[in-house]
Design a protein with these regions (language model features):
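Hydrophobic alpha-helical membrane-insertion segments
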Residues: 1-3, 295
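Low-complexity, proline/glycine-enriched hydrophobic segments characteristic of transmembrane helices
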Residues: 2, 346-392
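Basic polycationic patches enriched in arginine
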Residues: 4, 18-20, 303
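Leucine-biased recognition of intrinsically disordered, low-complexity hydrophobic segments
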Residues: 7-8
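Membrane-interface interhelical loops and short amphipathic "cap" helices
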Residues: 11-37, 68-76, 103-125, 176-196, ...
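Long, contiguous internal "core" modules enriched in hydrophobic/ aromatic residues
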Residues: 41-43, 62-72, 79, 132, ...
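Membrane helical hairpin/interfacial module
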Residues: 46, 50-130, 134
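A cytosolic-side transmembrane-helix exit/cap motif
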Residues: 209-212, 337-345, 366-368
Length: 392
């Protein structure tokens, strides 16, 4: 049943090769905002959403027993219990890979350590701690299901899952807030950015639950979890569409030259393909259509399927919807990063006067964009903004 995960080592090897050929700040081939940044934002959102979705599913529908009532053999556990365990394991892997992208983008071990140890406390520090803690809690929740731990009690798991949900919300919102705090990028100052990232993470969590139905047999708890995930995701996708329209309205209606340039990039520039094709077409329109179709079809089949012990919804269609959601989530982050990160410096409004970098920023390798004085005269007007995720 788990043979479908056999491609995972090849994916890990491929990502490792990409990291090996990428420079220390995540910038490759002259691009001013590297692939590592987008990968980190995507994987952190997927992992956070998956942990939250699996925890909520267990708290509301599965109620997996622990302690003396635990089933020693994982293969003999109920399908819903295996579904939750699989989503938790996959989410933990996504968070770990995202943390690896974060470390690779920083480039040096001392910069990584400074995120956790060096004062002062910043949003970047808090986000790094949240990602690390969520990864640890997700790993503990997954291992408790795969391993035989007879002394573990259900009440302890409920507390851990509640904590995991709180940390997942922090991680989901953190990425958008981090972009919002970067000076000189007006597009990211919109409150629609963290809202979009948080909604996208929630949609990804629902997608992982729906995709996980491919790997387990259908029972009452699985049907409830999958049906609820599909219904919630329909609402989340509609909210995403509203937030996306709000971000576009903010960009198109702004009088600021930098925001207008970002709007041009989203409409028909470098960010247009991931925004319109991946996010809007796949992640919003197509995913919504497939999920609504599954819900309508499943409503008529639910009673007969429950009597027969079959799955209430076509799992292949749900897996397709999940894949579309994940493609849209990646496209959203790629488009927002591309539209906001590479605007000319002269178009961006200085949010604060230049200051000497703090010890924490200096240790983490934070550097401000090159000044016009260094870039040289009038030629600096056409230079692109040198921004990485760790710029301030």
């Amino acid at each position: 049943m788990w043979n479908r995960f056999s491609l995972l080592p090849h994916v890990v090897i491929y990502i490792g090769e990409r990291l090996r050929h990428t420079s220390g700040n995540g910038i490759e081939g002259g691009a001013l905002f590297g692939e590592l940044v987008t990968a980190y934002l995507f994987l952190a959102g997927v992992g956070a959403g998956g942990v939250a979705a699996a925890s909520v599913a267990d708290l509301l529908f599965v109620h997996e027993p622990f302690g003396a009532d635990v089933v020693p053999d994982f293969a003999e556990k109920r399908p819903a219990e295996r579904l939750v365990a699989g989503v938790l394991a996959l989410s933990c892997g996504a968070l770990a890979l995202g943390a690896g992208c974060l470390a690779a983008d920083l480039g040096r071990a001392d910069r990584v350590l400074s995120l956790f140890l060096a004062p002062p406390v910043t949003l970047m520090n808090l986000g790094a701690w949240a990602v690390a803690l969520l990864t640890a809690v997700a790993a503990a929740l997954a291992l408790a299901r795969f391993l035989y731990v007879p002394w573990l009690r259900r009440c302890a798991m409920v507390v851990a899952e509640t904590i995991a949900c709180g940390l997942a919300v922090v991680v989901a919102v953190y990425a958008g807030l981090l972009l919002q705090t970067l000076s000189g990028v007006r597009l990211w100052s919109s409150p629609w950015v963290p809202a979009l990232f948080a909604l996208s993470a929630a949609s990804c969590g629902c997608a992982l639950l729906m995709a996980g139905a491919l790997f387990v047999e259908g029972d009452g708890s699985v049907r409830k979890a999958v049906r609820s995930a599909a219904r919630v995701d329909v609402v989340v996708i509609v909210a995403e569409a509203v937030a996306a329209a709000g971000l576009l309205a903010f960009a198109l209606g702004s009088d600021h030259a930098g925001v207008r340039a970002s709007a041009t990039s989203l409409m028909h520039g470098p960010a247009a393909l991931p925004w319109w094709a991946a996010f809007v077409a796949c992640g919003l329109a197509a995913a919504l259509a497939v999920e609504v179709g599954c819900l309508v079809r499943g409503h008529g089949r639910s009673r007969s399927a429950a009597k027969a012990g079959a799955k209430a919804y076509p799992t292949a269609a749900l897996a397709l919807a999940a894949a579309l959601v994940l493609v849209g989530a990646l496209g959203l982050r790629a488009a927002v990063v591309e539209a906001g990160a590479q605007r000319p410096l002269e178009l961006q409004e200085a949010e604060a006067p230049a200051s000497v970098p703090s010890e924490n920023e200096e240790a983490a390798g934070l550097r401000s964009a090159p000044s016009a004085e260094k870039s040289g005269g009038e030629g600096s007007a056409t230079e692109r903004e040198d921004v990485t995720l760790w710029s301030n």
